[in-house]
Swiss-Prot record:
Quaternary assembly: Homodimer.
EC numbers: 1.11.1.24
Record protein name field: 1-Cys peroxiredoxin
Active site, renumbered: 75 (cysteine sulfenic acid (-soh) intermediate)
Assigned protein family: Belongs to the peroxiredoxin family. Prx6 subfamily.
Organism in which the protein naturally occurs: Dictyostelium discoideum
InterPro entries (alphabetical): AhpC/TSA, Peroxiredoxin_AhpC-typ, Peroxiredoxin_C, PRX_1cys, Thioredoxin-like_sf, Thioredoxin_domain
Keyword field: Antioxidant, Oxidoreductase, Peroxidase, Redox-active center
Note: The active site is a conserved redox-active cysteine residue, the peroxidatic cysteine (C(P)), which makes the nucleophilic attack on the peroxide substrate. The peroxide oxidizes the C(P)-SH to cysteine sulfenic acid (C(P)-SOH), which then reacts with another cysteine residue, the resolving cysteine (C(R)), to form a disulfide bridge. The disulfide is subsequently reduced by an appropriate electron donor to complete the catalytic cycle. In this 1-Cys peroxiredoxin, no C(R) is present and C(P) instead forms a disulfide with a cysteine from another protein or with a small thiol molecule.
The protein's role, per its UniProt record: Thiol-specific peroxidase that catalyzes the reduction of hydrogen peroxide and organic hydroperoxides to water and alcohols, respectively. Plays a role in cell protection against oxidative stress by detoxifying peroxides.
Keyword Nucleotide-binding appears in the UniProt entry: no
A cellular component annotation (GO) from this entry: cytosol
Ranges of residues in domain Thioredoxin: 33-189
Reactions catalysed: a hydroperoxide + [thioredoxin]-dithiol = an alcohol + [thioredoxin]-disulfide + H2O
Amino acid sequence: MSRIQQVNKSILIRSFCTGAPSKSNFSPVGNFLRIGDVVPDFSQDSSVGQINLYKTLGDSWGLFVSHPKDFTPICTTELGRLAKLKPEFEKRNCKILALSVDSVKDHLEWMKDIEETQKVKINYPIIADQDRKVADLYGMIHPNADNTFTVRSVFFISPDKRLRAQITLPASTGRNFNEIIRILDSFQLTDKYKVATPADWVDGDDCIIVPTVFDEDAKKLFPKGFPKIKSYLRVTPQPNK
């Protein structure tokens, strides 16, 4: 193994680049989850009744989103957009859960506004976390912020209940759900094949062969070929296309 391959192998193991979950259990630091942690289970009331996270997700992927407050403009557009995109998440075996610290009553009233203004029915549960139990577990409330506002976060949960990624935005900035689908596509691809996805990659684009794969093995794994730009930079067509 060359020095470059040794260095890159070390980087891949440390950086979680291949998407393989770590073996650590849930161990939040300062109420914040780390990539690879097992996410904490919970039961809480919601717009569809009492739900349990693990039972709801089953063996599916999970997209768990928090929003700052019901009856707010950006959140209204976000939850409407997410409802419209639900078929795309279903294609990827991914279930959606939303959360804020508002009541079930507020959720149900607000859902009427979303359906009226965004022209779509809310087709996933919205958790009512009035006691902040879940928000505190997942570090959704910034310590310097109003304690009745959860931050705008997205948690990607794999079928083995591990946190694969987290995106957090301020209340002023709405989420890009096309990017969220892109990230999910990347996880599902790189979990199955020895590739990583480069900058601006979207489903169907060329991929990068991970540096831990030797050229001899790459020839067998990637029969479509791989231009070798550098010893550590080998491009190949997306293997499942």
